Amino acid sequence: MRVGFTPREGLVLYNVTYQDGDEARPIFYRASLAEMTVPYGDPAPHHYRKNAFDVGEYGIGSLANSLTLGCDCLGVIHYFDGFITNSRGEVAKIENAICLHEEDFGILWKHMDWRTEQTEVRRSRRLVISFIATVGNYEYGFYWYFYQDGTIQYEVKLTGVVSTAAVMPGKVPKYGTLVAPQLNAPIHQHIFNVRMDMNIDGANNSVYEVDIVPEEDDKNPYGNAFYAKSTLLPTEQAAKRLIDPMKGRYWKIVNPSKTNAMGYPTAYKLMPGDNTLAMARPDASVSKRAAYMSQHLWVTPYHEDEKFPAGDYPNQNPGGSGLPLWTASDRTVEDTDIVVWYTFAHSHSPRAEDWPVMPVATIGFMLKPLNFFDENPANDVPPSPKNHGSKHACCA
C-alpha cells in the first residue's frame, strides 16, 4: 500500500493488497474521497444557496489539521506530512496531516466446544489511516480501516459547530431546530462520493447487484426458501443503482477470470452502511451541479481524466459535468478495468444536543471479501497473551 495526499482530496490510497501467503493480491489501485456536497433544506433566501462542495470548491486536503498525539490519534503513531501550494504558489507543509496506527477492535473470532469446554478466541487488530479537515464551521474525520480478515471499512466522522441563523422571537422554524433562544440550526445533508479504481485479483473486473429474495412459489413448497440473486450490471446505465435495505442489497466486484478452491470467482462485496437519498428536487440547482447524488452506485470504465464525480470545476458550474456526462455514452463495464463510485448521505436534522459543539456522528461503508479466499484468512492469527501477568495465551 502507498499513502498519498492531494490538496483537493486529502488522503489517497494506492495499490492496496492483501498478503495471502507469498502472494500480494491486489484489491484496488486508487481510492479517495472524490466529492462532498452539503445541501441545506431551508428555502429562505440566505439558506437555499448554501450548497458547499467541500472537495471540488474548497479543496479538503488543503484544510487538513495537524494531528496531535493523544487527542486526534492514540497509541504508537506514524505521521505523514501533507504538501500543498499556497496562494502565492509556494509549497506549504501541513505537519502530521495523516495518522497511521493500529488499535484493538474486540473479538476477531471465537468458538467454544461445548463437549470439551475448550475455547479459542482471537483478538482483532485493525490498521487505521486517517486525516481530519476543518471546513468553516464543520470538522470531518476520514478513516480507512483494514482488518485481519481482509475487510476494508471507510468511515466519516462528523463534528464541529452547526451552521446557524437568527430567527424572530417566538418563531419555531419548520426547516430547522432552535438550539438556543432565537437561534435556528437549519436541516441539511452531507453527501459523500468515494471513487475506487478496483483491481480485484487483476485489472479486469465486473459488478453484480445482489438481492436477498424469496424463492418463487412453485419452487418453494414449504414457504421458507430464499436465496442471493445476482444480476450482472454490464453497462454504465445499467450500473446506476440505489440501495435497497429491504432486500439486503449489496454489490459484488468480481474477477471473472480467477476462482477460489470451490470454483467461485474471487470478489469483494460493497456493503452499504447508513444511507439515504438526496432530498433536493431534480430541478434544484444543487441537483444539477451535484448530479452524482441521484445514484448510490455508479460504475465507469477507467479513464485517466475521470476523477471527480461533479466534474473538474464545480465552482459556479451550472451542472451536467462529471458522472452524468461520462455515463451518457453507456460504455461497457463488464470484464474490463472499472472504477466504482459509491455515494452515501447523512441527513442532519439538528437537535439541542448538537449545540454548541456537535458530538461525533458516523457514516460509511464496508468492502468485505466474497469467496476471495479459500477459507477464513484470519485463522492463522496467533492467540493474545493474557493481561494478568500470565505467560499463557488467552483462551487457547
Language-model features: locations:
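Extended effector regions of multi-domain proteins
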Residues: 1-151, 157, 161-173, 177-396
